[in-house]
């Protein structure tokens, strides 16, 4: 109550921020006449002036009013678009490293030009991040006219782009691209063999479009670069037929072999299921007689068994994937787009291929991975814009430290959002949807029908076809025609069916969008200028008639056929209507058979319907019901937030290690000479070897000198007569022995240096270190995955799984670095190097020639970690640094508590 009173007196924080930014808007508006008086050349010269002022120490905040005024004037001259005052506020919010929530149709693409221009003045690069290649190309081509006019260069970073073009795109002042491509380029840059091969030049400022889609929806799915592993295709087929013979339990503790937990997206074998599965595996010859499914040798069988069960019970055709040209193509559950070339990891994709009877492709091995959460937190400054961020403001603040500011609309919102209608069955619901569509058609009102899956969109399409109603379908199977369909969805009486609308990027203009037809007329060389002008005028007049007719009919009507598990996605669908103050309306039609209601709210809503004795075909429409559904959505959102937070807490451990490895790699690439590092490694390896055979502070009787002689010969190629030395000098101390062995090793390596030229040997050393580091890092990633998948079981032993994971991951990491040192020392000591051909043999990286780029399914990425206990949040430091690198005397980032130079800094 007190907070409400304070808010009434002082206004909310959002209102106070908007008022604060409005003061700057006045300053920008005051500069407008002077900017209009400048010639094009004088306006362009302002960019160079701003750059010099920044170099001389003036802050971007001081330059902001003038810079924004320049961009506004440039937009007016080049694009015939003048930034509104609220768009200037949006630009300031984005420059401040915050999230701007702007309604659909408020001109987010134009707003982005303001902070992009201002931050490009630093010369460090600006990354404008979009959700797909089409939008990246469209926005870059559209806005590059303005940037080029003002003297800035623009690059487009697309997938499958040649290496040289990518480097050129990143060298530009402003680079447009997709979140996936920026992330994959970062990973690829940390897999190269020379510094010149890298494409990115540091992570300065990222401006993320559809920020909720990228930083929240896709945060559960790590980016993974993988290569094919050697698994038998037959195993997937056998597992598929065995899984099909297992019986699903109707209740969690009922009869059957396995239980499907739809809430946590997991499958669990029962005791009976274990026995049945073992019998079937033994029958198929996959399990030795008398052995258990959980013997160490059979762990991979458990992994494949669960993958097959999940493929059959949790992944459904035309909802989670489609079958196209004999391949399984994943469908993005948030945008409804097909994600061609993406594959689920950990054998799940192969299990789905076996289930659908298509060609099974081999399982992948992870070469490098990172989550969007950890990638985007590496930028010096991060900001984003979206139409729907307020519902996720808490998560943006918690995970990314980003504040959300709701920007006022240019014109007041006129859309009417009606209460949900809830029916008993899906059949009744769809009949009500058809009736509503028919009513809209009679009025000439355009309708957009939103669905949560391809299956539902095709079901409604079928019913509309039977009712002889013309319509357009927009889903992942049709995205080639996507922009055209959306552009015309506002025509009178038009019916458009669409899967989730996030990231579509094209506004629905009431009366239809004539821009495409106008462009065709202008491009027609056979028409005279007079004919073109006449046709365009007629087209615009026709559009105005249609536009007025749609306004009179009530604007665009949105029909939702199911509530999504996130309120934000529902709001995105609603937000398609009522753009820029247009009229519009929206209503959701639901049934107790819908997935969200069935899992979370059917009992409560069903009880209300029972009490009211609702007849068939009648809907319940009440604020209580809408509130119950919103509470169900909040539950799912809360659970999904916990999953993402959980994933981040686990990935933070890998991220600290990734930071150390990538810093080592970059130092190796940039170092002119790694000879000192090799020598330090050699000393460490010799000390470890001596400690194995001559334990510290041990008696001479406990020394295994013959064993040490053999180890030095086998591992380092050193023939040192240690026994003879001890016989000749019985008082020889352990330290003297150590010094003698190190001197002998150094002498042997110096002799090797004299045989090969110094540049060739330095190149060889660098190649060996990079190759060894890459190979063992890859194996370490697989080990971390396996550790994470089973770590939740520690909770049964009253241990905190997260702390256990952190402890064991550190032990694995330390062991990996010891292995790298040992391997590098062995190779450099034992391999003969005579020419550059020997170096090239080491530098070959065959696994990079046949790689795939994918999002892992979030459950696979997380394993069963959501079952584990809560642990405290970890502060995250990341490799691509905005500040100074880790100093030699600083605490090691791995969390050991030692100084960096005494821990993982030893490697460098």
Swiss-Prot record:
Top-rank lineage group of the source organism: Bacteria
- Molecular function as annotated in GO: ATP binding; metal ion binding; protein-exporting ATPase activity
* UniProt region (Disordered), positions on chain: 860-898
Report residues binding Zn(2+): 892, 894, 903-904
Enumerate the InterPro entries for this protein: Helicase_ATP-bd (IPR014001), Helicase_C-like (IPR001650), P-loop_NTPase (IPR027417), SEC_C_motif (IPR004027), SecA (IPR000185), SecA_CS (IPR020937), SecA_DEAD (IPR011115), SecA_motor_DEAD (IPR014018)
Which reaction does this chain catalyze?
ATP + H2O + cellular proteinSide 1 = ADP + phosphate + cellular proteinSide 2
Cofactors (names): Zn(2+)
Where ATP binds, per the record, is at 87, 105-109, 507
Write down a Pfam family by its short name.
Answer: P-loop_SecA
Q: How is the cofactor bound?
A: May bind 1 zinc ion per subunit.
Q: Name one GO biological process term.
A: protein import
Q: What's in the keyword line of the UniProt record?
A: ATP-binding, Cell inner membrane, Cell membrane, Cytoplasm, Membrane, Metal-binding, Nucleotide-binding, Protein transport, Translocase, Translocation, Transport, Zinc
Q: Where in the cell is it found?
A: Cell inner membrane; Cytoplasm
Which EC number applies? 7.4.2.8
One Gene Ontology cellular component term attached to this UniProt record is: cytosol
Membrane topology, as annotated, equals: Peripheral membrane protein
Return the NCBIfam families for the record. PRK12904.1 (NF009538), secA (TIGR00963)
Function comment: Part of the Sec protein translocase complex. Interacts with the SecYEG preprotein conducting channel. Has a central role in coupling the hydrolysis of ATP to the transfer of proteins into and across the cell membrane, serving both as a receptor for the preprotein-SecB complex and as an ATP-driven molecular motor driving the stepwise translocation of polypeptide chains across the membrane.
Q: Which family does it belong to?
A: Belongs to the SecA family.
| Self-association and partners | Monomer and homodimer. Part of the essential Sec protein translocation apparatus which comprises SecA, SecYEG and auxiliary proteins SecDF-YajC and YidC.
For this entry, the protein name equals: Protein translocase subunit SecA
Its source organism is: Methylobacillus flagellatus (strain ATCC 51484 / DSM 6875 / VKM B-1610 / KT)
